[in-house]
């Protein structure tokens, strides 16, 4: 059994601590491989401490699509992503720290009513009022606002898009028209 730093190192996947790095370091790590933003942010070998819930919130705050590839981001998008990552993590760490001081949490959940998009499928986006969309895959889902993050494009959900085939709605307008058929 290893103790101290050696013990921690054996289970640490090695991702950077966003609050302890600068924009250049953040960008360098996330562009090592050309991945989608969602996948890059949730890979603990790249970034430490960002899971499914916080990645949804970060991408919404940055107004970036979860399926944009890291090597396609423009400088101003990197600025927004880095700022949103730091501010989202800081805000939630502060909030959770205060909650823990008040009382020990009775249940731990990734779905919080204060979230903007995560776990809020079909509820209104707090920024624009459009319904939050989702992409389901395996045991996870990605939540996003099509208006704020994808310029109105509805991203394909593997299970539903296979079922609907060519009838899959590509935009918010097409989705609304489909609902009124």
What residue spans do the PLM features occupy?
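Short cysteine-rich clusters marking metal-coordination/redox-active sites
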Residues: 125-128, 145-148
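Short metal-coordination and nucleic-acid-contact micro-motifs, chiefly zinc-binding Cys/His arrays
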Residues: 43, 118-122, 141-144
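Short Cys/His-rich Zn2+-coordinating modules
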Residues: 102-116, 126-130
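Gly/Gly-Pro- and Ser/Thr-rich, intrinsically disordered tail segments characteristic of DNA damage-repair
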Residues: 1-2, 20, 162-166, 171-181
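Short functional micro-motifs and their immediate structural scaffolds
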Residues: 132-133, 153
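Short metal-binding segments enriched for Cys and/or His
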Residues: 151-166
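Short, flexible, mixed-charge glycine/proline-rich loop motifs
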Residues: 112-121, 135-138
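Phosphate/anion-contacting hairpin/loop surfaces
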Residues: 1-64, 69-72, 76, 81-82
């Amino acid at each position: 059994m290893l103790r101290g730093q050696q013990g921690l190192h054996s289970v640490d996947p090695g991702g950077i601590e966003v609050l302890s790095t600068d924009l250049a370091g953040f960008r360098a790590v996330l562009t090592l491989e050309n991945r989608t933003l969602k996948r890059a942010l949730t890979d603990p070998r790249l970034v430490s401490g960002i899971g499914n819930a916080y990645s949804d919130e970060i991408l919404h705050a940055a107004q970036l699509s979860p399926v944009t590839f890291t090597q396609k981001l423009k400088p101003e998008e990197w600025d927004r992503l880095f700022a949103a990552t730091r501010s989202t993590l800081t805000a939630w760490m502060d909030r959770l720290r205060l909650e823990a001081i008040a009382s020990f949490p009775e249940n731990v959940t990734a779905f919080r009513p204060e979230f903007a998009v995560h776990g809020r499928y079909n509820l209104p986006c707090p920024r624009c009022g459009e319904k939050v969309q989702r992409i389901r895959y395996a045991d996870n889902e990605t939540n996003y606002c099509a208006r704020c993050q994808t310029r109105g494009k509805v991203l394909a959900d593997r299970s539903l898009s296979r079922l609907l085939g060519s009838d899959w709605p590509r935009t918010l307008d097409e989705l609304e028209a489909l609902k009124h058929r």
